[in-house]
């Protein structure tokens, strides 16, 4: 699979953001990408959550997601992107990561579970958290993906849940706000999630000034294969399933856990048979 990390700089203008998304997705398609990942809140973004997010929120069959579906279908690549989804609460929409396959079909919608209530920021003041249930991986481009959103990265149990379900690639769509040590934390956490789950971890964050940028792909051994600076940009990298299988064969840590957590559902994908307690 050829993966494109699309580091955009969304603003508080849905139409303008859609134009930027269309341009960068076209660039990813021209580079031969099978999947392009866009940031959290790619549809609409501000430095702080306010009532305007509820005003612009759309259902999953609304015009913004429909435009993403049309892009995917026309250009023949899968898209993962952050949208503001209307919820049952008229004042608090969901922060949702949609997954659209290369045929333009919506195959997944992950609603952010862990809202950002830290560093003086309150995402929950205007965003409704997703259901407290284990999300399922989505299949795009022949790989199993585990969608996550920003602050989710700090909760290893979500990544481990995805790994136990056979996920090959963790995808963290983010708006990682700047601050002391935040860039180092972002990079370290992505590398840690990749190493401890022997999978790829792609982090795609908004560009400056709202976010730090610094989108990257961490390999299962923690090596950073591609990265961006704080400016808008596109990075393309090839993912080799054979290399993933080799790393899992060398380090079968997912099969060697002993603290009562479930083992991978498909042992063959983890580099060996499932071991029962």
Where are these regions (language model features)?
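Cys-nucleophile CN-hydrolase/nitrilase-fold catalytic domain and related Cys-dependent amidase chemistry
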Residues: 14, 22-103, 177-196
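Short polar catalytic/cofactor-binding loops
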Residues: 7-13
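Short beta-strand scaffold segments in enzyme catalytic cores
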Residues: 81-83, 96-99, 136-138, 201, ...
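Extreme N-terminal starter segment of soluble prokaryotic enzymes
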Residues: 1-4
């Amino acid at each position: 699979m050829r993966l494109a990390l699309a580091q955009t700089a969304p603003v508080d203008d849905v139409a303008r953001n859609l134009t930027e998304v269309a341009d960068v997705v076209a660039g990813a398609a021209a580079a031969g990408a099978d999947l392009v990942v866009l940031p959290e809140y790619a549809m609409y973004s501000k430095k702080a959550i306010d009532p305007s997010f509820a005003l612009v929120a759309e259902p999953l069959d609304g015009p913004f997601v429909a435009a993403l579906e049309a892009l995917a279908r026309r250009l023949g690549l899968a898209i993962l992107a952050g949208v503001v989804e209307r919820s049952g609460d008229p004042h608090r929409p969901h922060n949702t990561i949609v997954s659209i396959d290369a045929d333009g079909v919506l195959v997944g919608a992950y609603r952010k579970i862990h809202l950002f209530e830290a560093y003086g920021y309150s995402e929950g003041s205007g965003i409704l958290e997703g259901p407290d249930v284990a999300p399922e991986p989505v299949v795009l481009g022949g790989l199993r993906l585990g969608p996550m959103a920003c602050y989710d990265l700090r909760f290893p149990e979500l990544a481990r849940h995805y790994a136990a379900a056979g996920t090959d690639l963790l995808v963290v769509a983010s708006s990682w706000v700047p601050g002391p040590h935040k860039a180092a934390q972002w990079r370290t956490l992505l590398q840690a999630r990749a190493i401890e789950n022997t999978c790829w971890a792609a982090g795609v964050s908004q560009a400056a000034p709202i976010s730090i940028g610094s989108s990257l792909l961490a390999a299962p051994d923690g090596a950073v294969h591609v990265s961006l600076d704080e400016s808008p940009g596109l990075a393309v990298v090839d993912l080799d399933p054979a290399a993933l299988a080799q790393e899992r064969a060398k380090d079968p840590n997912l099969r060697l856990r002993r603290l009562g957590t479930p083992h991978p559902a498909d042992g063959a994908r983890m580099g060996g048979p499932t071991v029962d307690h």
